[in-house]
Amino acid sequence: MELGLFTCGYQYTSIESAFIDAAAFGYDFIELWGGRPHAWAPDMDAGRVAQLRELSARYAMPIRVYTPEHNGYPYNYMLGDEGQWEDCMRYLARSMEVSSRLGASRTLISVGHGGHTEPAQRRAR
């Protein structure tokens, strides 16, 4: 069994501290939370990706999973009008691009809460 450190709990510290702890405590990999300030997909330009890959190499701690922030505001794949859903799909595509550029083998997606919409409407999406 392998264990990964999910970096969401480090959102109020430097991302490097997550890599330091993962290495110090014997974790096998990083699950990188894709939220601000560390790795929000729209912020992930080539320079930011390079910084994170450098931390991964420095601490011998691979980024195997990228988990974009999508469990609440501003993205919910299950609610909103067509324009909001299309925006969510663009964000999802960008998140998967970021995951690939980071060298992660997985992107963890949570579809969010369907609210109280009609079941047929949810299935149609």
Report residues per predicted region.
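N-terminal amphipathic alpha-helix/helix-capping segment at the start of soluble metabolic enzymes
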Residues: M1-G4, S56
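Hydrophobic faces of well-ordered beta-strands that scaffold small-molecule active sites
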Residues: L3-C8, I30-L32, M61-P68, T107-I109
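Short beta->alpha connector loops
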Residues: G9-T13, R36
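Acidic (Asp/Glu)-rich catalytic clusters
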Residues: F19-F25, M44-T67, A93-G103
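Glycine-rich, proline-tolerant flexible connector loops at the mouths of alpha/beta enzymes
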Residues: E31-A57, V111-E118
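Active-site acidic/histidine proton-transfer and metal-coordination neighborhood
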Residues: A57-Y59, P74-R125
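Flexible loop/hinge segments that line or gate small-molecule binding clefts
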Residues: N71
